[in-house]
Swiss-Prot record:
UniProt keyword annotations, A-Z: Actin-binding, ATP-binding, Coiled coil, Cytoplasm, Motor protein, Muscle protein, Myosin, Nucleotide-binding, Thick filament
This protein's name: Myosin heavy chain, cardiac muscle isoform
Function: Muscle contraction.
Tissues in which the protein is found: Ventricular muscle and traces levels in the atrium. Also transient expression in skeletal muscle during fetal development and regeneration following freeze injury.
UniProt cross-references to SUPFAM superfamilies, sorted A to Z: Myosin rod fragments
GO annotation (BP), single: embryo development ending in birth or egg hatching
Start and end residues of each stretch annotated as Disordered: 1070-1102
Originating species: Gallus gallus (Chicken)
Superkingdom to which the source organism belongs: Eukaryota
Record carries keyword Plastid: no
Quaternary structure note: Muscle myosin is a hexameric protein that consists of 2 heavy chain subunits (MHC), 2 alkali light chain subunits (MLC) and 2 regulatory light chain subunits (MLC-2).
Amino acid sequence: KIKPLLKSAETEKEMANMKEEFLKLKEALEKSEARRKELEEKQVSLVQEKNDLLLQLQAEQDTLADAEERCDLLIKSKIQLEAKVKELTERVEDEEEMNSELTSKKRKLEDECSELKKDIDDLEITLAKVEKEKHATENKVKNLTEEMATLDENISKLTKEKKSLQEAHQQVLDDLQAEEDKVNTLSKAKVKLEQQVDDLEGSLEQEKKVRMDLERAKRKLEGDLKLTQESVMDLENDKLQMEEKLKKKEFEMSQLNSKIEDEQAIVMQLQKKIKELQARIEELEEELEAERAARAKVEKQRSDLARELEELSERLEGAGGATAAQLEMNKKREAEFLKLARDLEEATLHYEATAAALRKKHADRRGEMGEQLDNLQRVKQKLEKEKSELKMEVDDLTANMEQTVKGKANAEKLWGTYEDHLNETKTKLDEMTRLMNDLTTQKTKLQSENGEFVRQLEEKESLISQLSRGKTSFTQQIEELRRQLEEETKSKNALAHALQAARHDCDLLREQYEEEQEAKAELQRALSKGNAEVAQWRTKYETDAIQRTEELEDAKKKLLARLQEAEEAIEAANAKCSSLEKAKHRLQNEQEDMMIDLEKANSAAASLDKKQRGFDKIINDWKQKYEESQAELEASQKEARSLSTELFKLKNAYEETLDHLETLKRENKNLQEEISDLTNQISEGNKNLHEIEKVKKQVEQEKSEVQLALEEAEGALEHEESKTLRFQLELSQLKADFERKLAEKDEEMQNIRRNQQRTIDSLQSTLDSEARSRNEAIRLKKKMEGDLNEMEIQLSHANRHAAEATKSARGLQTQIKELQVQLDDLGHLNEDLKEQLAVSDRRNNLLQSELDELRALLDQTERARKLAEHELLEATERVNLLHTQNTSLINQKKKLEGDISQMQNEVEESIQECRNAEQKAKKAITDAAMMAEELKKEQDTSAHLERMKKNMEQTIKDLQKRLDEAEQIALKGGKKQIQKLESRVRELENELENELRRNSDAQKGARKFERRIKELTYQSEEDKKNLARMQDLIDKLQLKVKSYKHQAEEAEAQANLYLSKYRKQQHDLDDAEERAEIAESQVDKLRSKSRDIGMKKVDAEE
């Protein structure tokens, strides 16, 4: 009975020993499991770090790929811009060819019109000549008929006198033959009477001679008249030739003006395009800088938030498992989240304010454009008013012309007598000389104006050449900038090669990491095999524990050996982990070095940008200096030209005065010759008068002698008283006739004296006027000499100034050459910018399509984000459930023995991991919210960009319409100018005809034209200012386009970053789910183990 009890006691002891060993083995197993879990957790953390590194590498690769894609896109855009610039240049060349063809056609038509006008003018001149010749011949015929009539009358009178004398002679002869006896006594009387008859015949012959002289004088005067008429005709022909020359000059001036206007329009269009491009570039750069600043602010906020989140995570790790601290941290996070939301709202408000400011700027610019249009309309109305005024003046001039024509006809009708005709011709000659002088002065004025216009043309051509030089210098500067860009691209390529080398190093490290992971996996497999064997031994031990104690001891030893081996393997794994951590640190250091290199590259790019801006500022300063020097040069040149023009005018005036003096001298000579002729005629007339008086005295003496003879013969001839009475009666008749003739001759002589007195008075007045004109000419000559001296002094001063200006100009020319080189570079830059503009326009279209694609991608990302948020919520719910389960397990483990304290530590570590997962989930939520807000911002920015793009397109369309309208207006203006020129030619013809009596009107017209030219110059300056404003607007628009491009590229980059972040978060979520599944499986295992232990205890108690 005792032996079985002892056996039972021994068995109980053995069972107790076995239980103790079992408990020890269980503790060892738990330790090994805890160690295994630690290793698994470390392995998970290493896998996470590996994934993070892989994601970072992928992000860097994506960024590099994006950078390469951007470089490719920039190259493509550059090529597209170059193609577009080529197309634009081809269009410009085609348009220039079209303009040249139109101008050539216009010139041909104008030449044809001028030829037709010349033919018409020639026909009109020939008609006028024919009419004048007809009138001259008619006048000659009338004069000849009148002269013939006077001669016939004189001949009839002489024949009558001769007949009467013959009859008297025949009667005397009959009386003498009848009374020969009585004749002897009267023979003496007869001889005396015959002598008287001879004297009368001599006097008649003398009268005939006087008449012949008078006729000769008359013919001379008629010849002089004809000469004066021919001179008048020559003057009229000269006048017509002058009119034709004036017309030709006006036509040439109109052609030159049209050419200048066309060239100015082309230059202004090019300047508009350049300024529009520059304005666009500036606006885009401003928007880029603003967006960069905003981006920098957002990145700063993001970095601050990341730091705060890291600090919060460190605080959470330090706080451990305190729920109150978690709640406080959650509240803090919520407050920070609210702060971030407020900051985001403020940023959105700032963006809206900037958008409103941009809209206001756009509205102000539109208002300015409207004001400019109103100003142009006002100028147009002013021009129309001036046109109407000119039409009114033309109508007045035509009416005056008609009146002058009527007055001329009346004057021609009123020409009656020969003397009046002479006086009128003299007055007309004076008027024609005055008109000729006026015409010569006007001609000199027109020539000077023509010279000034030619000089202006030359100045404009020099300006065009200067602009072309500036263009070449700009092109050279653009080439230099292009070289700098190529150098930067080379440096970027070098950085890209360095990145590729870093990638290669990363790939090598990745391969090493994969090899170490494979080794780790092999160790894990060995551990799993050991665990499986332990489980097998445990099951065997549980079934055969009572029977096989010895085998259990052997197995225990083997397990201990295997545990030592596992510990050694774990130590080796730890060593490998440390080596992996070192490799990780090395990779992180390399990554930091790469980031530093990237920052250096960015800083180098920024420094290059700053250098470029400084270079642009230097170029602008040099441009300003060049413009100032050019303005000074132009001012000095203008002064020299004005002085030269004044000198030329004075020389012309001096030459004109000399010519006028020569003409006056010639006229004086002619007048002196005429005076000498008239004095000769007067002396001849006086001689004739003396001879007539002598004849009268002789006749009186003969009369007295005849009376004496008659008284002596009274006594002898009383029986013949009847006959003598009859003879006396006849003698009294002859006496009466003779006295009547003498009276007529006296009257003729008095008339001749009066006419000669009149001519002498007129000659005296002309001599007085000539003396006055000589005095005035001498005075003018003295004035001109004084003015010439002053002008020579001024010229010497001007020459000095010109010499100084040339010296300064040479100094400036050296600077200008340097500036021209820079300007050529800038011209090359402008060409590149034009090419980039063309590519940017195409790029805009591509960006529009890419924006649509990005919108679709954003919609997809929003859907994915919503799914991710839903999955995050589910994960958080799971994590909360696991947290509750873990807390229940911790309570159960507290009830268990104190030996399971290590399990509590492990559970606490798992709780910490869960908390980390919660923190990561919260971070992911915050990141998702940030991404959502950033997506909203990007959507707003994209919508704003679309609106701005639409506005830009509308403005570009409006500008294109305005340009088309301006071109149409220019074409219409060309037609109107042709019509105006034709009407102007007619007006000038009328004015030249009216300028015979209207000098003052012509001067007023010239003043009006000068005002018109001033107004046109003012208008052209206003047009230039408007064009400059348009150019600035276009430059600003180009800048905006560039900024929009950069914004779109940045949006693409941000979208890629968000996609990479989304992938990272999704990967983190997958890892958290895997960890949660692992924790659930561990909990299930613990539950099954606890159930098995409870069942075994129940079995043992039973």
